[in-house]
A protein has these predicted regions:
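Short hydrophobic alpha-helices and adjacent helix-cap/hinge residues
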Residues: 1-140
Length: 140
C-alpha cells in the first residue's frame, strides 16, 4: 500500500503519475482535492493503464472503473426519516445514529477498458453499470 499526497487540486495529476510502475490499482475516497480534480486523476490513470477504484457512484461516472459505497438515494431516505422524527417532536438525543450497511457496487466497463482492465461479466451483472443508467440523484 502506497500513500500519495496532493495538497492542492493542481497536484492531483502529478501525484497520480508518481504511481507509475509502483501501483497496480489506485483507490481514493471522497477527498476534496481529488474530487476537485478527479478528471485529471482519471486521465493520468488512463495513460498509465492503472484502474481507479473509489467509494462513490459519481466518481465512477467521472472516470473511475468501479466503486463500492453507499447509495446516495438510500442515504437520503434514512436521513429524511430522521428529519421527519425531529420535525414531529422527537428529541435529537433520542434518535440513534444509523450505519449504512448496505453497499452498492457501481461499475463502468468503458472506464475499465480505458484503464487497461476488463470487468468480468458477473461483476457487471452484480453492479450498477453507470455507462447505461442515470445517476441515482436524478428522477426516473
Amino acid at each position: 500500500i502506497l500513500e500519495v499526497t496532493a495538497n492542492r487540486p493542481t497536484d492531483v495529476a502529478m501525484a497520480t503519475r508518481s504511481l507509475q510502475g509502483r501501483a497496480d490499482v489506485i483507490y481514493t475516497s471522497l477527498d476534496n482535492n481529488v474530487i476537485s480534480a478527479f478528471e485529471a486523476m482519471a486521465s493520468a490513470a488512463n495513460e498509465m493503464k492503472i484502474p481507479v477504484i473509489t467509494s462513490d457512484e459519481f466518481s465512477v461516472r467521472r472516470g473511475a472503473t468501479a466503486a463500492l459505497g453507499v447509495n446516495d438515494y438510500d442515504f437520503g431516505r434514512v436521513t429524511g426519516k430522521m428529519v421527519y422524527r425531529v420535525l414531529n417532536g422527537d428529541a435529537i438525543t433520542d434518535i440513534k445514529p444509523e450505519v449504512m450497511n448496505k453497499l452498492t457496487l457501481y461499475v463502468s466497463p468503458k472506464h475499465a477498458k480505458q484503464q487497461g482492465v476488463t470487468l468480468d461479466s458477473s461483476v457487471i451483472a452484480d453492479g450498477i453499470n453507470v455507462d447505461e443508467t442515470k445517476p441515482s440523484n436524478e428522477a426516473s
